[in-house]
Amino acid sequence: MTKLAYFECPTGIAGDMCLGALLDLGVPLSLLQDYFRRLDIEQEFELQVSAVHRQSQQATYVRVELGAEPGPPGKHQHSHHRHLPEIERLILSAGLPHQAERWSLDIFRNLALAEGKVHGIEPNRVHFHEVGATDAIVDIVGTCLGLHWLGVEEMFCSALPTGGGTVKAAHGKLSVPVPAVLQLWQTRQVPVYDNGIHKELVTPTGAAIATTLAQSFGPPPPLSLHQIGLGAGTLDLSLPNILRIWLGESAASPASGTHPETVTVLETQIDDLNPQAFGYVFDALFQVGALDVFTQAVGMKKSRPGILLTVICRPETVSACETVIFKETSTLGIRRSQQQRTALQREIKTIDTAYGPVQIKLAYHDQQLVNVQPEYEDCAQIAQTHHLSWQQVYQAALLAWYQQSEIIGVK
């Protein structure tokens, strides 16, 4: 069984609406506040949570009250601004759960790429208000923490309404959808429509969350629905201004226990790069969301020995992966292709060992457990903490899993 979240966005999506829906689903506010303290930004804002009504429907409303600075208020004007590298350092030093950390970094990097393209500069050089603001950090990191706490493994999103009109921003008055939102939509080819409401319905933060995390856009996938969380928007609209997150589970196919997915394969041959650089390239690619990276020895023109670099990634991280390849290698071009891959149904469980908790990845085929693998990062952290070999921790985790699974009757 795979835990799914479907974002239904009849009046759009914003970061505070995501937070509200997740809190409505039961995510502890204290959990979010604890991690915000670790981000060292808790002194910059106050999180206000309340139950409100939108067109007679009750939903959870979240307001990020910032420490004010002089100047007129505006929807896209924030008190605290940061560049992308500073935000990355905050996230990486906060000790977030690994998946929440990865999602948060991916969302901010995709938003930075979009803003960079809009303004014609490198993402790391963009000093832009929406990403650098404290409330964007709270919205994005809080959303990722909430999804991780709920155990969500796959996310989907409805088509998004375009909205209309204009909005005041740090760069002046902008047409809605604002340029960064359009850029994010274009990257994922998001289906959009006009619902007749001419307001800003999709914010850059909301668009970045949706385009980074959602596997696809459209109607909800087949699922067994367990809960619905309602997150309220700020405006009173002609429709209930509510984001609904459907939380449920999708069973593996009875026939095979596998599911197909679309991935993008990037390839390039290189014959003039210092071999020492490839380790750094691998790390940089995995940091921006690559699923797999590998190299092969090849013979190139003029009988030169070379390296074929292959990167497998999801469609939403193609741009970030290509940026790393162009920046960190000597290649002049990258081939891109779409492929289908079949993946076993997977599940993550936590097992207690003598050294501490370790996450275990379980894989199923024909609804039968076929593979059990302790997570590398958990084993490595315990090995370093207790001065043990990684192999010793790995074997202890496997042994603990099989012993405890026999007790509870797992097959």
Curated annotation (Swiss-Prot):
A single Gene Ontology MF term assigned here is:
lyase activity
Residues spanning the signal sequence: none
Keywords recorded for this protein, A-Z: Nickel
Q: Which InterPro entries match?
A: Ni_insertion
* Record-linked NCBIfam families: nickel pincer cofactor biosynthesis protein LarC
The family annotation for this protein states: Belongs to the LarC family.
PANTHER family this protein is in?
NICKEL INSERTION PROTEIN-RELATED, PYRIDINIUM-3,5-BISTHIOCARBOXYLIC ACID MONONUCLEOTIDE NICKEL INSERTION PROTEIN
Spell out the protein name for this chain.
Putative nickel insertion protein
What species is given as this protein's source? Answer: Acaryochloris marina (strain MBIC 11017)
